[in-house]
């Protein structure tokens, strides 16, 4: 079954609704430049209110590994999602000392799954998120990845690697993405929002229903 992560949660009512509708994980953004940024205390309160077996994911952009571990431990987050060129193999290993890692790639047209294998062998990380590449942006483009590039990535992932698809996913297009790429998980933020950080409960429910319906075929 395809897992679902709803990212950019900023309000308790949205966290509870996402869990009720069937999301498997919720993302909390700690990048100060993001319109979806939350404080540590706010994230901790929301994570503590989640039902069992729903994971909290911390989203970080170019932040210090020690800060990441401290935030994840304080908030009760089980995964750190790492955006940015800072997170080399060595920097990623430092984060892994305290929390599991979801490594983000923003692949350009010449990207190949061999880069994923190299990173896994060097660090032990097995979960990778692929988001649409746009110069100067670390995610949140609201645009889908080019189809042939996405197909090349997800069809060529090494055994034991878990691919998460992000970028422009919404209730209207996610079913096709599931059926054509069969990703391990999907990540959506703006595709289920009324405005940045304010989720539409109707869109979240429709997104989850579309993913589940696609998986039944």
From Swiss-Prot:
Kindly state which reaction or reactions the protein catalyses.
N-(5-phospho-beta-D-ribosyl)anthranilate = 1-(2-carboxyphenylamino)-1-deoxy-D-ribulose 5-phosphate
Q: Which Gene3D superfamilies match?
A: Aldolase class I
One Pfam family of this chain: PRAI
Give the source's domain of life in one word.
Answer: Bacteria
Keyword set includes Amino-acid biosynthesis: yes
Kindly state which keywords UniProt assigns to this record, in alphabetical order: Amino-acid biosynthesis, Aromatic amino acid biosynthesis, Isomerase, Tryptophan biosynthesis
**Which pathway, per its entry?**
Amino-acid biosynthesis; L-tryptophan biosynthesis; L-tryptophan from chorismate: step 3/5
Q: Name one GO biological process term.
A: L-tryptophan biosynthetic process
Enzyme Commission number: 5.3.1.24
Molecular function terms, GO-annotated: phosphoribosylanthranilate isomerase activity
Q: Does the keyword Amino-acid biosynthesis apply?
A: yes
* Family as reported in the entry's similarity comment: Belongs to the TrpF family.
- PANTHER family (alphabetical): N-(5'-PHOSPHORIBOSYL)ANTHRANILATE ISOMERASE
Instruction: Show the HAMAP family listed in the entry.
Output: PRAI
- Designated name of the protein: N-(5'-phosphoribosyl)anthranilate isomerase
| Species, as recorded | Chlorobium luteolum (strain DSM 273 / BCRC 81028 / 2530)
Q: Kindly list the organism's lineage.
A: Bacteria, Pseudomonadati, Chlorobiota, Chlorobiia, Chlorobiales
